[in-house]
Amino acid sequence: MQFIKRTFPRRAFVDLLLNRFCLREFATTYSVSVSNARKLVRKRLLIADALKFKEQVNNLNEFRNKKTKSSLIRNDGFKLAKNVSSLLQKESLEKALHLLYERSNAKKTVAYNLVLQYHLAKGHYNAAWSLYNDMKKRQQKPSDHTYSILLKGFCDAIEKNKQGNFSKLREYSEKVTASALKESNNVTSNLHHIRIISKCSLKLKSMVLVSMIIPSIKQTLDFYSGSQILRLLNDFSMFNPEQREEVLKMGTNLWNYFVLECQKKGIAVDESLICSFVKLLATSNSPQVRNVGLNILTKVMGLEYQIFEDSNLRYPLPPYCDCTSRSLVTALQVIRQIQNGDLLARYWKYFEESHKFDLNLQVYHEKLRNLVQQGQAAECLNTIKRMSHNGPFPTQQTFLIVLSLCKRPKFYSYTKSFLDLAKKLNVPVEAT
C-alpha cells in the first residue's frame, strides 16, 4: 500500500478501479451480443438449409412424378405396339388401326412402324404412304427407323413390280428421301438411309434421287454409296446418250471430291469406287476419256505399264488402293466395251508377265467373253486347254460362255470340239 500511495494519488487509483470495472462490464456485454449474433446467424443458416432441403425434396418429387408419367406413357406405347403386333399376326388389320386411332397419350411411333411394315410386306405401298401422312397429321413424329422401313419397303416393291410402273414409287421415294435427310441429324442413321436411297435410286433410275443424295454422300464420304451412284450414272450414260456429257460431269465431280478428300486424310480409296468410275469413263464418246480410265486403273494397280500415251485430260489419282482381281476384271470389261482386240492381247500378255495378281476363274471368264465378242473360237479353245493344265480348272460356266459363240453359223463347227474337250475334262455340259 505504501508503494501504491507513493506511486498513484488517491484520485488516480479510484479512476483506475472504475475503468477496470467498466471494461469488465463492456467485455461481458460484448460477449453476450456476439453470442446472440452467432445464434441468429446459425438460426438463419438452419432456416435456409431447411428451405433449400425442402426445395430439393419438391424438385425430386416433381422429377419422380414426371418420370413416372413419361414411363407410364412409354409403357403404354409398348403395350400398344405389342397389341398391334399380335393383331397383325392374326391378320386383324382393322382392329390394329382402331387401336392406333384411339385417343391416348401413348407414343404410337412403334405401333405405326409395325403397321407400315405390314402394308409394305403385302405390297400395299399406297396404303403405307397414306398411313405415313396420317402419322404426321396426328403429331406422331417419324423416327429414323420409320424412314428406313419406308425406303427399304419401296425398294423391295420395285423389285417385285414386274410391270415397271415406277411413277408412284419414284414420287414416294423422293419425298421420303427429302424428309429423311432433312430431319435426321444422326450421321450413322443418315449413312444407313443414304445406302438404302442409293440402292433405290439405282433401281428406279432416278436422277432426282441422285442429285438429292450426292451432297450427303460427300458429307459422309461413304465409298459404298459413291460406288452405287457411279454405277447408276454408268447406266444413264449408256442408255441416254443425249445426257451423257452431263452425267460424266456429275460422276467426275464426285470422283474428284472423293480422291482429294482421301489425299488430305491419307486414306485408301475403295476399289469398288475406282472400278465404277473407270466403267463410267468407258461410256464416253471421246476415245481420250476412255483411254484415261484404263490408265487410271493400271496406275492404281501398281503396274508399270502405260496402255495409252498421256493426254491433256487430268484426273486426280488416289494415294493408294488395295487392289484385287476385281480391278483386272474391270479392265477386261472396259476393253470388251470399247471393242479393242489388239489392246486385249497386249494387256493380257503384260498381265501374265507381271505376276502381281492371281489369275482366277472370273478373270479368265472375262477374257473368254472378250474372245467370243471378237469371234476368236480357236483362241477360246487354246485358252481352255491352258486353264486345264495350269489352272484354274474350267467349269460348266466356262464352256457355256464359249458355246454361245457356236450359235453363230460361222462357228457352228467348233461345237463338237468344245463338247469333246468338256467330256475329256469331265465337265458336264449339254449342247444348246
UniProtKB/Swiss-Prot annotation:
Species of the source: Schizosaccharomyces pombe (strain 972 / ATCC 24843)
Cleavable signal peptide: none
Functional description taken from the UniProt entry: Mitochondrial RNA-binding protein that acts as a general translation factor. Plays a critical role in the synthesis of all mitochondrial DNA-encoded oxidative phosphorylation subunits, which are essential for mitochondrial respiration. Essential for the expression of iron-sulfur cluster (ISC) proteins as well as other heme proteins related to iron-sensing, and thus plays a key role in iron homeostasis.
Keyword annotations of the record: Activator, Mitochondrion, Protein biosynthesis, Repeat, Transit peptide, Translation regulation
UniProt superkingdom: Eukaryota
Subcellular location per the Swiss-Prot or TrEMBL entry: Mitochondrion
Protein name as it appears in the record: Pentatricopeptide repeat-containing protein 2, mitochondrial
Disulfide bonds: none
Chain's gene name: ppr2
